[in-house]
Amino acid sequence: MKRLQALMAEQGPDIYPEVIAALKDDPREGAQRLVRQCQTYLKERERQRAVLQRMYNYERQLWSMGYRHIAGIDEVGRGPLAGPVVAAAVILPGEVELPGIEEAKRLSDRRRMELYRRIREVAVAVGVGLVQPEGIDEASVVVATYKAMMKAVADLPVTPDYLLIDGVHLPNVSQPQVPVVGGETLSCSIAAAAVVAKVVRDEYMVEMDAKYPAYGFAHHKGYGTPEHRLALERYGPCPIHRKPSDGTPAGAVLLFTEG
């Protein structure tokens, strides 16, 4: 059994079926535990592959039509009280494996960062666009979202020939596009963009936490948590806080509505 364990460490999951075949009739508890571990791993890998197969349906259809540089686009940061709207655009080279991508918005910070590095490693191109609070205040969060997405597309070092966008139709772009409602669960390209946008925005808010430490931005990333609302009541808004649609500073509105 030690020899098999050494082979597993050396060759990885590809040898798991051989391990299962060699040990399935071995009555020792250690052998059966190893069999169960291999079976569990292989079952989960097959599940992830099936999910990936489904999540490449949009891309696969477009590749078959001759499109090569398909950009998935998503954004994060529409709902916070502070910080920018961030959008990302990602062009993948084909049906690359991105373990955990189907849970892009529910991953732990550590797993999301691992996936982010993997996306950066394999992507044909990655673009990012930010619209700061003053840009949101001047128009609306919807317009800011469009602007961030268009910036992300413009930031791509490779020009996309088709856009897959999470839930919206992007105005004033030359490429053909399709809005995909719930896109981060239906398209790997969109899900990859969601991961990139989330990591970029979170890192930005950690930087802002160092600049404005009273608000706890590193913890809540600008969202309206009790901690954040309490800090707003105590200190008022800082330069990266957004204004409500009537132009009143965020802190003043909170003091009035929660007073």
Curated annotation (Swiss-Prot):
Function: Endonuclease that specifically degrades the RNA of RNA-DNA hybrids.
Residue ranges annotated for the RNase H type-2 domain, each copy included: 68-257
PANTHER family: RIBONUCLEASE H2 SUBUNIT A (PTHR10954), RIBONUCLEASE HII (PTHR10954:SF18)
Residue sites binding a divalent metal cation per the record: 74-75, 166
Location(s), subcellular: Cytoplasm
Name the UniProt record assigns to this protein: Ribonuclease HII 1
Cofactor: Mn(2+); Mg(2+)
Keyword Hydrolase: yes
Gene, per the UniProt record: rnhB1
Cofactor note text: Manganese or magnesium. Binds 1 divalent metal ion per monomer in the absence of substrate. May bind a second metal ion after substrate binding.
InterPro entries named in the record: RNase_HII (IPR022898), RNase_HII/HIII (IPR001352), RNase_HII/HIII_dom (IPR024567), RNaseH-like_sf (IPR012337), RNaseH_sf (IPR036397)
Catalysis performed (reactions): Endonucleolytic cleavage to 5'-phosphomonoester
The enzyme's E.C. designation: 3.1.26.4
GO molecular function: manganese ion binding; RNA binding; RNA-DNA hybrid ribonuclease activity
S-S bonds: none
Any one cellular-component term (Gene Ontology): ribonuclease H2 complex
The protein's enzyme class: hydrolase
Pfam families: RNase_HII
Domain of life where this protein originates: Bacteria
Main location: cytoplasm
